[in-house]
Amino acid sequence: MVSKIMNKKYEKGLSLIESAMVLALAATVTAGVMFYYQSASDSNKSQNAISEVMSATSAINGLYIGQTSYSGLDSTILLNTSAIPDNYKDTTNKKITNPFGGELNVGPANNNTAFGYYLTLTRLDKAACVSLATLNLGTSAKGYGVNISSENNITSFGNSADQAAKSTAITPAEAATACKNTDSTNKVTYFMK
């Protein structure tokens, strides 16, 4: 009889251990799913930001075809086109937002011929900054930059992308160095011809 009681106690204990193992396994699976969900979400935001830049570039080039300059170009012009999806239009504040919660700023070169116009994505975290800084826009781009303070005043393009304008596409190693702000305050700028 004592033997039966002891066996029952061991069976209960074994059941609790099994339950704990199942809960631990479930927690591990949940953590993995959350990690991959965040990764997929960030990737989706980056792809949406790239699409937004491409759409804005296409709209600007279409609107200014045949014009001698990009004078007067700003976000309000793009707000009145279908190039920017409605969920990124902040018509109240006359701004274009980006998928990372920042803005897409556009403007002409400030009385110089170094480039035609610029597009800047703001409030990017480090990972988004690296991803978007390495976007190569081909022959329509005059240059690229990370964390530049006065985009419209750039008059020359050099070999560094860190707080300066670079004449060639930014490499992943350069982007990792230039995107140094860890508090989602990085900016990526594309200078267009």
From Swiss-Prot:
<dbReference type="InterPro" id="IPR012902">
    <property type="entry name" value="N_methyl_site"/>
</dbReference>
<keyword id="KW-0281">Fimbrium</keyword>
<keyword id="KW-0488">Methylation</keyword>
<protein>
    <recommendedName>
        <fullName>Major structural subunit of bundle-forming pilus</fullName>
    </recommendedName>
</protein>
<feature type="modified residue" description="N-methylleucine">
    <location>
        <position position="14"/>
    </location>
</feature>
<feature type="disulfide bond">
    <location>
        <begin position="129"/>
        <end position="179"/>
    </location>
</feature>
<dbReference type="InterPro" id="IPR007971">
    <property type="entry name" value="Bundlin"/>
</dbReference>
<dbReference type="InterPro" id="IPR045584">
    <property type="entry name" value="Pilin-like"/>
</dbReference>
<comment type="subunit">
    <text>10 to 100 laterally aligned filaments or bundle-forming pili coalesce into rope-like bundles. These form linkages between the bacteria within the enteropathogenic E.coli (EPEC) microcolonies that are attached to epithelial cells.</text>
</comment>
<dbReference type="GO" id="GO:0009289">
    <property type="term" value="C:pilus"/>
</dbReference>
<dbReference type="Pfam" id="PF05307">
    <property type="entry name" value="Bundlin"/>
</dbReference>
<keyword id="KW-1133">Transmembrane helix</keyword>
<feature type="propeptide">
    <location>
        <begin position="1"/>
        <end position="13"/>
    </location>
</feature>
<keyword id="KW-1015">Disulfide bond</keyword>
<comment type="function">
    <text>Major repeating bundle-forming pilus (BFP) subunit. Is required for EPEC localized adherence.</text>
</comment>
<feature type="transmembrane region" description="Helical">
    <location>
        <begin position="14"/>
        <end position="35"/>
    </location>
</feature>
<keyword id="KW-0614">Plasmid</keyword>
<dbReference type="GO" id="GO:0016020">
    <property type="term" value="C:membrane"/>
</dbReference>
<keyword id="KW-0472">Membrane</keyword>
<comment type="similarity">
    <text>Belongs to the N-Me-Phe pilin family.</text>
</comment>
<keyword id="KW-0812">Transmembrane</keyword>
